[in-house]
Amino acid sequence: MAAKNLPKVFFDIAVNGQHSGRMTFKLFSDTVPKTAENFRALCTGEKGKGISGKPLHYKNSYFHRIIPGFMAQGGDFTMGDGRGGESIYGRTFKDENFTLKHKGKGLLSMANAGPNTNGSQFFITFVDTPWLDGNHTVFGQIVDGSKVLDLLEQHGSRSGMPSAKIEITDCGELKD
């Protein structure tokens, strides 16, 4: 994780239509290059439309599941409710590796429906989540905007249903 020139991406977040700030992430392309590239390209939208016919882009998608003390999940830009999404490689792609662990707040990891079912859905941790190690690929970490992440957590619930509409209003890659 000490490699130089790791890609950085951002999410601009709105809560109920009100701009609420930006989260910036570094992507661990040195450890999980395929997974990091999927997320980076979904932030930029550079791959055009996917199999679903929808843009391969996180812009204007929502965080559909937020559980305080656990994580915020988003990335379903096809259905919007956790049942959809797709990767830049097709609907899904295989688990790359589980080298990086779910140790800490602000880690980006792939949400999935079992082994080798990575698409576009991801989650951001609020705490250590070691029970996810070996099942979900960690591929990035927040480097700026932790107060925005705290705001997401405040809008979560035990059921996971957010108490507000949390939208990614813009996203992309930051060049140094």
Swiss-Prot record:
SUPFAM superfamilies in the cross-refs: Cyclophilin-like
Spans through the membrane: none
Top-level taxon of the source organism: Eukaryota
Enzyme class: isomerase
Record's catalysed reaction(s): [protein]-peptidylproline (omega=180) = [protein]-peptidylproline (omega=0)
Entry's family note: Belongs to the cyclophilin-type PPIase family.
Protein name: Peptidyl-prolyl cis-trans isomerase cyp6
